């Protein structure tokens, strides 16, 4: 019922053109003008880029974390951008690459999962969600060829397996599962090195959160495009835990405590010159 009292009609589709639970197909069919199209020229250096995202499994789920810095070439475009989002109640996605298209992709992905659940009456499986995201990355390939690369890291709780899982993607939409941890973005290599040294089977939630923050902290020491914890400005990474209870974000007070511990460890061992 609309505000003017008129009833909303149930949309009917020809069986040959019924989009079903695919929200992207519905938009393309009935609102094609709202679907982004590719332009001409290389745009990669002109837009803000998100940098480092890390994820790791622990005994009861998965942790996903992202720094807060966005860059335009050699400049810091934003110090407080958020790159980790809930996809739905039991999954989350972190973004690296061109910030604008990446955030827009996440929003469409969130709506797609909600649309599917409303149409089908049940949530998509975790692998199904990863496949859906892979398809969206594949559709972004024309923009990626112009420099607007979107590179997500997807993680969530698999109720069928009763475990956390991590999925990575390539620019063409290839989907790959990581068994323990992974990191993407400009600081991804340094973050992965820290995760490799610190991860172990049976890691608990507190240890996983600490290791995720440490991975971003160490990446920021080596990669200028990755922002480390900034207590002066009150800026800390976005860190989320996803387990059988769902997605929840770790509060900044806990992250500040971890950052202080990491600073103290650097002072004790001596800063690298």
UniProtKB/Swiss-Prot annotation:
GO MF terms here are:
threonine-type endopeptidase activity
| InterPro entries referenced in this protein's UniProt entry, alphabetically | Ntn_hydrolases_N, Proteasome_sua/b, Proteasome_suB-type, PSB_actinobac
EC number of this enzyme: 3.4.25.1
Enzyme active site: 51 (nucleophile)
User: How would you summarize its activity regulation?
Assistant: The formation of the proteasomal ATPase ARC-20S proteasome complex, likely via the docking of the C-termini of ARC into the intersubunit pockets in the alpha-rings, may trigger opening of the gate for substrate entry. Interconversion between the open-gate and close-gate conformations leads to a dynamic regulation of the 20S proteasome proteolysis activity.
Which reaction does this enzyme catalyse, per its entry?
Cleavage of peptide bonds with very broad specificity
Keyword annotations of the record: Autocatalytic cleavage, Cytoplasm, Hydrolase, Protease, Proteasome, Threonine protease, Zymogen
GO BP annotation list: modification-dependent protein catabolic process; proteasomal protein catabolic process
Q: Which residues form the propeptide?
A: 1-50
Q: Which residues form a coiled coil?
A: none
Q: Could you name the Gene Ontology cellular component terms for this entry?
A: cytoplasm; proteasome core complex, beta-subunit complex
Subunit text: The 20S proteasome core is composed of 14 alpha and 14 beta subunits that assemble into four stacked heptameric rings, resulting in a barrel-shaped structure. The two inner rings, each composed of seven catalytic beta subunits, are sandwiched by two outer rings, each composed of seven alpha subunits. The catalytic chamber with the active sites is on the inside of the barrel. Has a gated structure, the ends of the cylinder being occluded by the N-termini of the alpha-subunits. Is capped by the proteasome-associated ATPase, ARC.
Q: What does this protein do?
A: Component of the proteasome core, a large protease complex with broad specificity involved in protein degradation.
- Record protein name field: Proteasome subunit beta
Record lineage? Bacteria, Bacillati, Actinomycetota, Acidimicrobiia, Acidimicrobiales
């Amino acid at each position: 019922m609309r505000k003017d009292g008129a009833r909303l009609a149930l949309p009917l589709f020809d069986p040959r053109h019924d989009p079903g639970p695919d929200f992207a197909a519905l938009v393309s069919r009935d609102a094609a003008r709202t679907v982004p199209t590719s332009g001409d020229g290389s745009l990669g250096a002109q837009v803000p880029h998100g940098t480092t995202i890390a994820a790791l499994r622990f005994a009861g789920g998965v942790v996903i974390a992202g720094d807060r810095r966005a860059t335009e070439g050699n400049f810091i475009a934003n110090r407080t951008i958020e790159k980790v989002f809930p996809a739905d109640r039991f999954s989350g996605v972190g973004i690296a690459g061109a910030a604008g298209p990446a955030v827009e992709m996440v929003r469409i992905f969130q709506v797609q999962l909600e649309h599917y659940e409303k149409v089908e009456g049940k949530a998509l499986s975790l692998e199904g969600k990863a496949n859906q995201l892979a398809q969206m990355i594949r559709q972004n390939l024309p923009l990626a060829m112009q420099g607007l690369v979107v590179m997500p890291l997807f993680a969530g709780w698999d109720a069928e397996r009763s475990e956390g899982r991590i999925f990575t993607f390539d620019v063409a939409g290839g989907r790959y599962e990581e068994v323990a941890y992974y990191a993407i973005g400009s600081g991804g290599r340094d973050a992965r090195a820290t995760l490799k040294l610190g991860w172990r089977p049976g890691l608990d939630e507190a240890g996983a959160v600490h290791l995720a923050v440490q991975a971003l902290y160490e990446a920021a020491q080596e990669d200028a495009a990755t922002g480390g914890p900034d207590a002066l400005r009150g800026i800390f990474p976005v860190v989320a835990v996803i387990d059988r209870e769902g997605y929840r974000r770790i509060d900044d007070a806990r992250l500040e405590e971890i950052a202080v511990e990491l600073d103290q460890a650097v002072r004790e061992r001596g800063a690298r010159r």
